[in-house]
Amino acid sequence: NEENNFILSKSGLVIKYNYLNKIKEYKINYDEIETYLKEEYKMDDIVIPVLTPTKRNLNKYKNKKLIALTFDDGPSNNTKYFIKELQKRDALVTFFVVGNRVKKYEDVLKEAYLMGNQIGSHTYSHKNLLYLNEEEITKEIEKTNEAIYNVIGTKPTIIRVPYGNINKKIRSISNMNHILWNVDTLDWKYKNSNRVYKEIIKHAEDGNIILLHDIFKTSVNGVLKAIDELKKQGYEFVTIDEMVYLKNIKLDKSKTYFNFK
């Protein structure tokens, strides 16, 4: 049984479905269906996304060595290719997206989410929250959450603040779970796929959270090579939510998480 997902907007009804592990879609123009809609579903410019992501059977990952690969600053032109390659490898990751990039890449964000990848917040414009007042911090977080909601139909529950700069005030204002990292590949600095590969292999340990950026093609290439190697060593690649579930951890919004060891 394939699960159907639909997005209803003023432009029409788009039905997305998984067929032979590929996301297909069928579109009906709004003016063709408006007569048949209940009043509460008729709209002007309101978008109501209803998406159901693929859920893996996590039982097969119990007692496995788990790594959470996390990607900041996207989505980007590399993301579509990347998620398709991840799918071939039965690997899922977490994307901490920048809110002001969501609209431009909404199609790939939907596809990533439908495949089972997790979407988190990286704030709206990547400002250092330590230097913002309460109103500005709130705006950075809420605008991102709304942007993500308008695309996938649910708000993120996890956030990674820019530069990893976090304090008690930011945690309190956000009311979200804060995920940082314990392995920084410095992929943004060197932009070298072989170095990315070596850093991931070098720091591969159960429970690690690895920081990367899918805006760089070198990062994408290095990651895919590392996944292929580490799969041979018995590692599995999971989202933050999957990691938390498999390790039976209850997240606390008053804490900041660097790994799940």
Regions found by a protein language model. Give the residues of each.
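Histidine/acidic-residue-rich catalytic or RNA/ligand-binding cores of hydrolases
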Residues: 223-224, 249-254
